[in-house]
């Protein structure tokens, strides 16, 4: 049995992996830009990459910027993974150059056809030129078509200037001496529907619509069109878009003046499609129509087509799109790690230099990021935790912590494992889970070479080499490498001893933390490397930590078990924040 959409599904999954940087085994470097991809996919479509990967096992491939531009390669990469290729007069040359250099023959063929179309538009045949000009030779570069409505209701004849050309090159003008009641409508070849924009005459008194066109790109039907003014004094603008006509080369400049002499601002709109003009439903309604048009375009904000997220500036959208495209132009020169944004690289470099510019005024503790200082102050110096859960009234220091906690109540788990279908509330938890499938252990001890799946395991392990024991019993002074062993010590040795008020309060806090950890919080944790004032020992207990055990049929620890065994002794806000730091 053959599934018809299996190939599309496979390509879609591969593209999502590329955008997330998951299982990408090669990096294409073009100047400052880096593109993650899968070498088997590239080699399947490009003879260039096929030849390279037959002779080398290097992960990084450096391309010549003079031969392959970053924008052109990005479009080419999207075509390879999605089968979609959007060509226009702006990008076709870059895409063709990149495809020709990388030997992607299918794209080369498509680009050549498109370039021939554009060349035909720029240099039409003599037959078509003669049909436009008759016996008049056109050598000028631009042609100004001006359409004026004098709007004289008492006169039966209206003089309308249709075409004004350079007088030195000859007159190219036709005048209509009579008004016609019948309106002409022309079909757009793209939609097959009538495309008409009507402007009420009382709004368009003393109005002018200027169409600036390239004379060499002017098709015959445009000259033959006539602007009609009927008895109702409505100005109807109609246009025909030929298949060979580049609509993006047309700029409409509309100037509207009111009867009382108050002029409206000019609206210059560069259309990507002539049909877009007709898609606006009568923007010139009532006397404030000009303001309505301005508001229509001023309210339009950049939006991500993938997630629907709206941004205040186009530059913010461009930075955001790097996440989906896998573009990481900012590279650390010390370790080679790449980032999508400049501030991410700046923060990362501090892990090499040890710089901690944000200092706590109360305890002189330093932090690499400002958000860490804010969290420290709220957690340890009694500052307000402004983010409160509406369900359980638990308060958090950051909005992201509250958002993660809220998923405990809603049950939302947006992150799905594409291998087994298990769902998670946080991306980092999915990352840990995937490592169970792949066996990846990226955190390696510099002393003995032992590898771990999570950074907290490495931190606890490293204390065996350094002898550090940060967890001290306040009753007897014994110290331990992790808080779990400290709790065991208190239970066995000091369970019957007289407790001081401080120790009783601490035990009460620990018991509260235990009860919190017993709640279903298995997928509400995220771990990122950073600095924190909280103890960074997320204890593993013994060496045979569940995270390091292989998964078998008889023993398959759940993500809840794995994560709970990693962290002990912290309240829920601390757990969430620690997960975000690592």
UniProtKB/Swiss-Prot annotation:
Domain of life assignment: Eukaryota
Cellular localisation: Nucleus
Residues passing through the membrane, by range: none
Positions of the BTB domain: 24-89
Nuclear localization signal, short sequence motif: residues: 174-190, 257-262
Pfam families reported for this sequence: BTB (PF00651), zf-C2H2 (PF00096), zf-C2H2_6 (PF13912)
Phosphoserine: residues carrying this PTM: 289
Keywords, comma-separated and alphabetical: DNA-binding, Metal-binding, Nucleus, Phosphoprotein, Repeat, Transcription, Transcription regulation, Zinc, Zinc-finger
InterPro entries: BTB/POZ_dom (IPR000210), SKP1/BTB/POZ_sf (IPR011333), Znf_C2H2_sf (IPR036236), Znf_C2H2_type (IPR013087), ZnFinger_BTB_dom_contain (IPR050457)
Zn finger residue spans: C2H2-type: 302-324, 330-352, 358-381, 387-409, 415-437, 443-465, 471-494
Residues covered by region (Disordered): 169-197, 489-538
Principal subcellular localisation of the protein: nucleus
Keyword Transcription applies: yes
Amino acid composition bias (Polar residues), ranges on this chain: 188-197, 512-522
GO MF annotation list: DNA-binding transcription factor activity, RNA polymerase II-specific; RNA polymerase II cis-regulatory region sequence-specific DNA binding; zinc ion binding
Signal peptide (UniProt feature, chain positions): none
A single cellular component GO annotation: nucleus
Compositionally skewed regions (Basic and acidic residues) per UniProt: 495-511
Family classification: Belongs to the krueppel C2H2-type zinc-finger protein family.
Protein name: Myoneurin
Organism: Pongo abelii
Lineage of the species this protein comes from: Eukaryota, Metazoa, Chordata, Craniata, Vertebrata
Recorded name of the encoding gene: MYNN
